[in-house]
Amino acid sequence: MKKYFTIILIVCTCTLSYGQSHFIHNNQTNPSFEDPYSINSVSPYGLELEREIVLLGSGVLLNISGLIVTNNISPLTVQEINELDVNDISSFDRNAIKPHREEVNGDLLLYGSFLLPLTFLANDNTRRDWQMLGVMWLEVMAIQSGINLLIKGLAQRTRPYVYDPNTPLEKKQTVGARLSFYSGHTSTTAATTFYVARVFSDYLSNKTVKTLIWIGAAIYPALTGYLRRDTGNHFRTDVITGYLIGAAIGYFIPEIHMRNEALNLSFYRNFNNESVNISLNYSF
């Protein structure tokens, strides 16, 4: 999971660098252009130094704690594997027990989710706020990765494929074979898709577009979870828990960054009496 987090940092850095140069170029070549799907040019979010330090610091501490816990886990012995009983698994989870398969195991969907924040470049206002959105995404990924790693290390739940007699013994005797709960692939994709969907919902006004974005955000991690269960990597409860935790993190990180108040100012010229009308909206 830590290699995934490293990839996230690299992708995010590339995203932010490109977003800055592209935004400057767009302003210079066409400064009057406005995205018809945007609410307005006022950002719905704000950053506060103390809060960001707490969030990012918490993510780092969670990841360090998770690494310490998982590094102290020992693989299952042959005797422990032989003593595993399928009947100890609830009927709700039992159908996940099957031979381990590497093909179509959700990795591509996981890697693909790291590219989803690049879609912020398609909108003028989200592109303008690339630095702030980048910080928020790092917080989402750091907290999600840390919580997942720590809970995996504490739970030490045996993966479904370990119960299957057709899975090679060497695959069963790895530390990873004891990190079933909860699904990191599912929680990571859910955190990312719900984060992206929440951000666009706060920036866009077109209800149809927002609905389609949310539908995609819900389906993407669900498909990831299905593949993780279907390849013997996770039980159904692993996937459901990962989905809910990841979605909550992706949704509520933007929520706690919402501005407490917004001031919108607009004006237009009345050509009948040559007067200027000013509209002022102040909301909490």
Regions found by a protein language model. Give the residues of each.
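Sec-dependent signal peptide recognition
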Residues: K2-L9
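Lipid-exposed faces of alpha-helical membrane segments in multi-pass integral membrane proteins
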Residues: V54-S65, G112-T119, I143, I147, ...
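Structural signal for the C-terminal ends of transmembrane alpha-helices
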Residues: L121-T126, A197-S201
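Transmembrane alpha-helix/helix-exit interface in multi-pass inner-membrane proteins
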Residues: Q144-V162
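N-terminal targeting leaders of membrane proteins
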Residues: V11, L16-N125, K152-L154, Y163-G176, ...
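Interfacial segments of alpha-helical transmembrane regions
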Residues: D124-I147
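Membrane-embedded catalytic cores of phosphoryl/pyrophosphoryl-handling enzymes
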Residues: D164-N270, N277-S283
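Second-shell loop/turn segments in exported
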Residues: Y45, L133-L138, A177-R178, Y182
